[in-house]
């Protein structure tokens, strides 16, 4: 054994004897062992760090094989934390104390708090501390002690919820959650350490009162810590909510982008279906080949844009091939356009011109059967109820007379009181995409379906059937023909058309000539005329109601203010305030609903209820099964329009706000700001939680309801 090892064992023996004397002495162990001049510390230091580097701890490190190229510390040579303190000459506890000991020299560099620590967070007298003193943070133990009551309360509440989870609610009050009942009950507080308020007020013992004061002060300290902990949780929740809000915005934009993609694919899917119908109808089907693809690619610059296929087809059908070289051109020899021309050569062109109008009308019915949408927009349901989605300021120069849209974020058509045309809008892109010209006077009513079919009626006593897709294609290609999108014109009425409704192949229109006409959309012919006979006279309630900024001041209410048809059922609302239910198969009235005291301006029905609005300011809800009035309510101004679904009824009455009535719970609320400078709402349309309203200043707004 070397001399270094012998000295090491000798020093270790001295250290062990010193340790035994410390353990059996009456002086505190920490003061003896960890003092700067401790003989125990000195002997152990000499034992472990013996001169010459012969200590066991140093040998262990040199004996371990370290991997090359890695920067490892002393702790990295052991697989777990316990092996870090193992050696051949001392137990792990002793080694831990030695290795974790910090001398006074090292502690001199540690930052010190010049302000003495005050255990009390507030003074006993409840006075605020001096502004110069720094705020003392609670210790870890104080925070743990303050959180214990909250933890216990949470555990008790959880136990109550578990105990009540198996109990079936027998009454409405028993079905209320336990935590809700706890919140409704008044909170009772008590003094700490079972102190009684009466005893404190009547006690003359100074020591008892001092102890009580300290106890209450300590309790206030704990409450202050609890409050700070709760405030910290609120701040953390606010941060999390902000992050969740940002994430929601990102996902919201993703949904909007996906729905835009769906609309794009739906549009091209409809074009493909129309193409298939045309090929099948004219028996032009053939096998697809690579040469067809080359010819189509070669014609891509010459072929019309999307939506112009029908126009190209009609032009090819009526234009003969005069150039022989063009007829044998390799570019067109095997293209589908050449087949179209060859097919039309064999057909009777004059006969096609004769029946071209009836074919357009027939295509509307075919379109309805084939164009079934696979997807529908749902983005509106992710907006807050009553929030504005978009705005189209000054969409028209004057007030909006009528508007309609096919689906949320889809296509909208609108008309103004001084316009003789219809404007077509893309609600998702918030811009005008087409204009429909053809009426000779202002347009008073319109309806659009989800298949891009629009029917309008105006003061020129005509109805027009429009193809919106064709209008958008013509607008995109800068077509010079204004009436290409008009498929048909119905012109049997002799006065202004005030109301229309179409369902499937049937179209019903009401006019100031006091007739209701039924049209066949397959042939364009009027199949039935119903005369509406009622006595005329001054409207009683209207004369006593002051209107503000209303177009109703300048004209009398229409003879037929509203109507709706479904299959063989027809409902009409007229100037005499009576709702008539008709059977279109017989052309006779089957029921009359009386109750309004003025002209009816709007109505709508579903399978159960009929809702009517009139100039007597009232909304009436009728039960169609019994003909009895189910509900009635009124507003301050006459009703101009209404629309509803299974959940809500939206109403306009020449006021700045849209009135909303919840059909399920009966609640009334307003949508928009009550600001007269923004104009009054004249017309509303509502579908699938998506509201579009037109105002007297020409603005159009969309809302999430």
Swiss-Prot record:
One GO cellular component term: mitochondrial outer membrane
Annotated spans, Disordered: 110-136, 290-310, 342-369
Membrane-protein topology: Peripheral membrane protein
Record's compositionally biased regions (Basic and acidic residues): 125-136, 342-351
InterPro entries: G-protein_beta_WD-40_rep, WD40/YVTN_repeat-like_dom_sf, WD40_repeat_CS, WD40_repeat_dom_sf, WD40_rpt
Similarity comment: Belongs to the WD repeat MDV1/CAF4 family.
Job description of the protein: Involved in mitochondrial fission. Acts as an adapter protein required to form mitochondrial fission complexes. Formation of these complexes is required to promote constriction and fission of the mitochondrial compartment at a late step in mitochondrial division.
UniProt protein name: Mitochondrial division protein 1
Naturally occurring in which organism (per UniProt): Kluyveromyces lactis (strain ATCC 8585 / CBS 2359 / DSM 70799 / NBRC 1267 / NRRL Y-1140 / WM37)
Organism classification: Eukaryota, Fungi, Dikarya, Ascomycota, Saccharomycotina
